[in-house]
Amino acid sequence: MSGLGIMVLALLLLVFMATSHQDGGGKQATQRDAINVRRRRSITRRVVTETCKEYCEDRDKTCCGLENGQPDCANLCLG
């Protein structure tokens, strides 16, 4: 009976290890996608024109780029 118990415990341990390994891969992929979105946003959003700079400087803010054709001003640009 103890041999059968050890085999069952070993099988449960293997199943647990296999499922936790799969979950870890999913989490990694999600984190990697989130990082890629942040990089893409920061690259595409930083289109700053002189008009935007002047518009935001008049309001004592920083130009973060154009949003829907309008200057996007903020104290600190995020993303």
From Swiss-Prot:
It holds the Pfam family Conotoxin. Transmembrane segments: none annotated. One of its GO terms (cellular component) is extracellular region. Residues 1-20 form the signal peptide. Disulfide bonds join 52-64, 56-73, 63-77. The modification Leucine amide is found at residue 78. Keywords: Amidation, Cleavage on pair of basic residues, Disulfide bond, Knottin, Neurotoxin, Secreted, Signal, Toxin. The presence of a 'disulfide through disulfide knot' structurally defines this protein as a knottin. The cysteine framework is VI/VII (C-C-CC-C-C). This is Conotoxin VnMSGL-0122. It comes from Conus ventricosus (Mediterranean cone). The lineage of its organism: Eukaryota, Metazoa, Spiralia, Lophotrochozoa, Mollusca.
